[in-house]
């Protein structure tokens, strides 16, 4: 269960939650539909200019695969080592509910070709990719759900935390204006509901109809039968059409059904947050988050899973700090003393190769055989979880090297050590 998609996403969250408990650090990586819609950033750009360029030229592309590798330190019988838990998520902004944003995005042909050449499964991305709702969209959709329920039920108490400017007049107090072309349909529904109320059946299933017709049915029946009935929308077995079920209820039952339905829809909104739940779990763990040349990864993660990017680098750093309090870039680390002379080339593959040579000693790392592909024997460069895995391996190796400067030398340096502080949040 290495590649996590819709069917097993909740199982992945359980595994991730367990792995995050008492872990040492987390490594991340992303794959994108493109890199730059214009020119690449200049080599002499200031950090502020680089941020502005990336913000303006990259955010129309999507992060479509998120790799997360969680490293948990365990003292082995023969030395010191880590257990690594790699998670690979396909990410696609599917409109999982009616009020969710219907996103547009760019693709860069060279980037798509590159991903295909490395085995990226676009069928899995589009068919089973995990969606997401940012915190801003989550609140907006919840407000829309609450307003709609309050309008249908004529009950302002259902608006627990909606906008104070929202006015919820009871639909029962307003005449329903039914367009001429829909009057025969509504008249037939009213006749059937009238016969139902005069009978003894517990429920009445109406014929499938359009969303607008359902709205008219709700408003009309609510107006003519303000009490004693509860209306709910269901989906046909083939999931192609929707219809209304009318039930007899007491006022107490009606109120509880309305509250239960509202809560279920609010829970669905939280469920639709999708990959944002992964971000939240990592953020709440407070662990060091490691990436390689990670500026672009962080920009996309903030933009897609948190909210709109601010205008300035200072504001962006503040935004990132609210989510990831401790970030470490292995490329920056490799370009900083005492590593600078040891890494003439700082690409991720080159970094990995150098970490296998003196004076470095890679720590012993194992991957659980159940639920995870063993990256220790299977190289899959440019699969996000694999790149996150080797990024974490490089970081652990470089961190341990710092221990050789201590007196006496230490074979392992923790991510929380003071020796790591100079490389954080750069």
Regions found by a protein language model. Name each.
Residues 4-63, 67-69:
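Entry/capping segment at the start of metal-dependent catalytic domains
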Residues 38-47, 58-426:
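Metal-dependent phosphoesterase core characteristic of DEDDh/y 3'-5' exonuclease domains
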């Amino acid at each position: 269960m290495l590649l996590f998609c819709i069917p097993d996403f909740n199982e992945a969250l359980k595994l991730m939650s367990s792995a995050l408990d008492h872990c040492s650090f987390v490594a991340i990586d992303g794959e994108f539909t493109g890199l730059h819609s214009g020119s690449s950033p200049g080599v002499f750009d200031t950090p502020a200019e680089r941020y502005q360029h990336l913000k303006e030229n990259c955010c129309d592309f999507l992060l479509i695969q998120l790799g997360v590798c969680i490293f948990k330190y365990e003292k082995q019988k023969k030395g010191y080592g880590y257990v690594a838990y790699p998670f690979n998520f396909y990410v696609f902004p599917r409109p999982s509910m009616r009020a969710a944003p219907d996103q547009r995005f760019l693709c860069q042909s060279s980037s798509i070709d590159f991903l295909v050449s490395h085995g990226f499964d676009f069928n899995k991305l589009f068919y089973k990719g995990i969606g997401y709702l940012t915190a801003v969209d989550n609140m907006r959709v919840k407000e829309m759900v609450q307003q709609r329920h309050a309008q249908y039920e004529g009950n302002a108490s259902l608006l627990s935390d909606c906008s104070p400017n929202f006015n919820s007049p009871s639909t029962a107090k307003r005449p329903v204006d039914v367009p001429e072309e829909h009057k025969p349909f509504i008249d037939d529904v009213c006749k059937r509901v009238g016969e139902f109320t005069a009978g003894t059946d517990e429920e009445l299933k109406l014929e499938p109809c359009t969303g607008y017709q359902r709205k008219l049915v709700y408003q009309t029946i609510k107006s003519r039968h303000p009490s004693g009935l509860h209306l709910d929308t269901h989906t046909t077995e083939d999931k192609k059409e929707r219809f209304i079920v009318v039930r007899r209820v007491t006022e107490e039952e009606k109120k509880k059904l309305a509250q239960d339905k509202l809560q279920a829809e609010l829970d669905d909104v939280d469920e639709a947050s999708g990959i944002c739940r992964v971000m939240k779990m990592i953020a709440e763990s407070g662990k060091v988050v490691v990436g390689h040349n990670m500026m672009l990864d962080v920009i996309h993660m903030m933009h897609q899973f948190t909210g709109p990017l601010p205008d300035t680098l200072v504001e962006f750093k503040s935004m990132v700090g609210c989510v990831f309090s401790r970030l470490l870039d292995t490329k920056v680390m490799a370009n900083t003393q005492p590593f600078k002379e040891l890494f003439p080339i700082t690409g991720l593959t080159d970094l990995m190769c150098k970490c296998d040579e003196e004076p470095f000693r890679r720590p012993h790392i194992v991957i659980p055989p159940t639920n995870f592909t063993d990256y220790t024997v299977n190289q899959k460069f440019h699969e996000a979880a694999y790149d996150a895995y080797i990024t974490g391996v490089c970081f652990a190796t470089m961190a341990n090297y710092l221990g050789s400067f201590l007196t006496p030398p230490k074979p392992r340096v923790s991510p929380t050590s003071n020796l790591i502080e100079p490389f954080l949040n750069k």
